[in-house]
Amino acid sequence: MDLTYIPEDLSSCPKFVNKILSSHQPLFSCPGDNVFGYDWSHDYPLFGNLVIMVSISHFKQLHSPTNFLILSMATTDFLLGFVIMPYSIMRSVESCWYFGDGFCKFHTSFDMMLRLTSIFHLCSIAIDRFYAVCYPLHYTTKMTNSTIKQLLAFCWSVPALFSFGLVLSEADVSGMQSYKILVACFNFCALTFNKFWGTILFTTCFFTPGSIMVGIYGKIFIVSKQHARVISHVPENTKGAVKKHLSKKKDRKAAKTLGIVMGVFLACWLPCFLAVLIDPYLDYSTPILILDLLVWLRYFNSTCNPLIHGFFNPWFQKAFKYIVSGKIFSSHSETANLFPEAH
């Protein structure tokens, strides 16, 4: 946002608001008052993540450490779509915040908490996959139910304490008198960070977990290649030839999945955190339209998560068929076999 012409006091508010309104084009253009229900960016995260939540909760065959992490992440993304995004859509459409400063602080705190929680879940899933691929014999002793509970407690509690503590204390806008004038003049409601907290947020909430994920997935990719080379020495005229084909196929799928996970993560989050880091040093000169686009780019990650971690897996596809066909309401459907190839 351009804070160059922020007035020094509230007496110049009308002139300032007219200037901003004349230069700002809303991100969405929706006729009528119903901007909640008909936008794919709001509906799909709700639907996709709800399917993941129902599938893992209902089908006992999906009760595994990895899937419990995915279930928790889907809950995070569902809450983002259900609680946060409707108000964000209204803010983007109307270019204004109508719900007061108190609810603005709750909205921005909860928004940041859920987004950071989603990132922490991605990092936890990477750790889980690391043990599953690199140390398969030790996986069941490392990734126990107790370990998963500790990871989930960390993924939820740390972002909650950080986000609500930062926003409610107004430490993120400390020393930014122009921000307070902007809120008073313009009914402004958006996450804004000063130089110190912008740097802290970039380092601890993006660079550190992102580096961990890149390192872990790089290691997984290398180990998968090593496994494939070992299996390639199995004689073709043995039963191992079939396992060789399946392992190579799984290796290619694993490499593809890893590429998609990291590609989507970096595409959705790198521009956003770069703006958080750089914008304070540019005197907040980034146009509001660009900031709006970055907000929705972050939300887009919640749309991609159920696709990457759920629907690309054949057992979730079968669970989805059970749900849409209504078979999920039949007796003993929770014990349905979603892995027929295993028998």
From Swiss-Prot:
Glycosylation sites: N145
Pfam families: 7tm_1
Any single Gene Ontology cellular-component annotation: plasma membrane
Tissue: Not expressed in the pons, thalamus, globus pallidus, caudate, putamen or cerebellum.
Disulphide bridges: C104-C189
Spans through the membrane: 36-56, 69-89, 151-168, 173-193, 199-223, 258-278, 288-308
InterPro entries associated with the record: GPCR_Rhodpsn, GPCR_Rhodpsn_7TM, TAAR, TAAR_fam
Residue intervals annotated with topology Cytoplasmic: 57-68, 169-172, 224-257, 309-343
Region of interest (Extracellular Loop 2 (ECL2)), ranges: 173-186
Highest taxon of source: Eukaryota
SMART domains documented for this protein: 7TM_GPCR_Srsx (SM01381)
Record topological domains on the Extracellular side: 1-35, 90-150, 194-198, 279-287
Function, in words: Putative olfactory receptor activated by several primary trace amines.
Protein name (database record): Putative trace amine-associated receptor 3
Protein's organism: Homo sapiens (Human)
Top-level taxonomy: Eukaryota, Metazoa, Chordata, Craniata, Vertebrata
